[in-house]
Amino acid sequence: MSLTQIRKQELMTEYQAHETDTGSADLQVAFLTERITQLTGHLKANPKDHASRRGLLKMIGRRKRLLSFINAREPERYQALIKRLGIRR
């Protein structure tokens, strides 16, 4: 259920701040958003999978904290990121 290497590379080229960026907050939010999307689809097909639901809620909380971090420091970067990711917030 994790991200494939190919998809991870695609996300990295799209969201990384510079060539050697592997863990910026923007990139982490992009990875989490992709995994959240995958897990949401999984849970629609498997509604009784409570362990995955708990993992999904943890990921959503982590993404929320990262977005709050970005918003506190650079609100315009935050707005651009949520617009690019299509996150309604």
Curated annotation (Swiss-Prot):
Record's GO cellular component terms: cytosolic small ribosomal subunit
Positions in coiled-coil regions: none
GO molecular function ontology, one term from the record: structural constituent of ribosome
Sorted UniProt keywords: Ribonucleoprotein, Ribosomal protein, RNA-binding, rRNA-binding
UniProt-listed InterPro entries: Ribosomal_uS15, Ribosomal_uS15_bac-type, uS15_NS1_RNA-bd_sf
Keyword Cell inner membrane set for record: no
GO BP term, pick one: translation
Spans traversing the lipid bilayer: none
Superkingdom of the source species: Bacteria
Keyword match Ribonucleoprotein: yes
Role, per record: One of the primary rRNA binding proteins, it binds directly to 16S rRNA where it helps nucleate assembly of the platform of the 30S subunit by binding and bridging several RNA helices of the 16S rRNA. Forms an intersubunit bridge (bridge B4) with the 23S rRNA of the 50S subunit in the ribosome.
NCBIfam families: S15_bact (TIGR00952)
Assembly, per entry: Part of the 30S ribosomal subunit. Forms a bridge to the 50S subunit in the 70S ribosome, contacting the 23S rRNA.
Family recorded in the similarity comment: Belongs to the universal ribosomal protein uS15 family.
Protein name (Swiss-Prot/TrEMBL): Small ribosomal subunit protein uS15
Annotated source species: Synechocystis sp. (strain ATCC 27184 / PCC 6803 / Kazusa)
